[in-house]
Amino acid sequence: MTHSPPHLPISPPPHLPTSPLRVWRCSHFGGHNFAPTLIDLPEGRYWGHLDPDILEALIHRNVPVSQLRSFYRGWAGLGQYEQILERELWMQFGWKWLSYLKAGQTLAIDPENEEWEADWAEVRIDYASPDGAVQGAYTARVEVSGTVLTQWSSKTPELAAVKQYRLCELAQV
């Protein structure tokens, strides 16, 4: 990523469609100072650790979604624990999942820790295809599976343990 004024429109590479794709750039945002990050608007999907091949796959949606699992960070319409379930449902439903209407809720959460540092949460996602022909709901338990040491800022070299989560007890309701 380059260090230019934010919100400066740039042209997409010549091999990518010119409409309705609109590419913007900025130096960085949020906590992702060390890897390119994308917010796909107006959908509100977050993607991380991108490279040109992955970006092209996202634009054309021409690879199996399983190849993109590690790049998908979640959808802005859901809470952090609901996003973990939503990613798994995307893996099951494929590209069509991104067009489904969704609503998420946290049913229960670890009372021993702060909400953003919970060791577990029970979540639910209700969904429907745009025409209503496919609809349903899933619940799951999200639990800590370990930690990863990460550097929060390029200004401070200290590493901090950050909880990593896994999906447990997935059930269609």
What are these regions (language model features)?
Residues M1-V173:
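Histidine/cysteine-enriched polar flanking segments
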